Amino acid sequence: MSISNIIHGTCSPEYAALGNAFKENFTERNEIGASLAMVVDGELVVDLWGGVKDQQTSKAWEADTLVNVWSTTKGLTATCFAMLVSRGLLTYDTKVAQHWPEFAQQGKQDITVAMLLSHQAGLCGFLEPTSLEQLYDSSASAARLAAMEPLWPPGTAHGYHALTAGYLANELFMRVEGRSIRDFIAEELHSKHGLELYIGLPPEKAAQAATIMAQSGMTSSQAALELTTVQLAAMANPILSPTLPNTAGWRAAEIPSANGFATARALATLYGSLAQSGILNETQLVEPSVLAQATSPQISGVDLVMGVDIRWGCGFLCNSLNLYGTSPKAFGHSGWGGSFAFADPDRRLGLAYTMNSMGSELVGDPRNVAIMNAVYG
């Protein structure tokens, strides 16, 4: 099959290098199925997709193909909180226990919303053995975390809350807004703005979903460099298979830190709006002053779980080491395996990449590097 039959969509001529990098992900970097989108000044200038969404059936990746984006989901959750703050329903300085009294147990009474969203709460995982079935119960998981003693003094360090960030955020969100993050996204972003963004996979969207593929033996515990107690709790309790998103249990669950399903087009459109002072379809999703707070580093340094230097905003990854280009103002989130989405306010762009072939790199996936080099040179 020629590459012209693999790649579909549109790419403005001035971004031909980006289109070529996407094609080369298939011809040179073993991509299987993927989509790439970029919005500049509110205009969709790159909208490409290609390959297959299921290697066994050879079904083509289509314009509306959805795929699990793992922790790229966290950027959606961060955006939802920024929308709540913009609506005056809470502030980032608000103490979590003000809205969720049970959370104050075990010395957690002074943890703020900002601390919770920036992975400072010390609740990055469970110490007691945990099953997949327990992970799929968001409310019960949130209750366990509310009763838990932090793994480090809150506010003194940060450790990536890979899954638990979703339970914590969802429970707080419901206490404040009334709706779950899944329902909020469905109503405020999908229904109102047509964005193909979901927490979990709605049953009626099953035919659009890509099948995740990974190398044999790949697990979530490989993402931790040294399995300390904190890392074991965060990354290996339980150990997750990268193909878990293909299962009915995962798709039905509500884990707004990891089981988001999306198109690159929808992610790029959302981040494109955040790159333009929070305006989407002439609607002020997020106030500029709130966006500035949400994307300002709350804490930085070596992450206790990931073992690399990270700057955390209020749920967003703040740009460092040119992860999201050259602008220090850029922000976004990346997911296990290679998906990512970000905004660059200096260039007024939003970009997203989604795929179904799980890469093994913690940082520096060759597909991502090629895409970023094509944008920033």
Question: Whereabouts are the PLM-identified features?
Answer:
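Active-site helix/loop module of the DD-peptidase/beta-lactamase fold
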Residues: 63, 68-72, 84-128, 146-147, ...
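Short, conserved catalytic-motif segment at the N-terminal edge
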Residues: 6-69, 91-94
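Active-site-proximal alpha-helical segments within enzyme catalytic domains
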Residues: 119, 165-172, 258-280, 339-356
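Active-site SXXK
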Residues: 16, 22-23, 42, 65-94, ...
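Active-site Gly/Thr loop motif
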Residues: 210-264, 292-347
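Flexible glycine/proline-enriched surface loops and loop-helix/loop-strand junctions
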Residues: 62-64, 148-155, 165-168, 247-256
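Short, charged, amphipathic alpha-helices and their helix-cap/turn boundaries
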Residues: 48, 131-153, 179-196, 238-243
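Short, gly/Ser/Thr-rich active-site loops of penicillin-recognizing serine hydrolases
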Residues: 255, 276, 295-302, 361-377
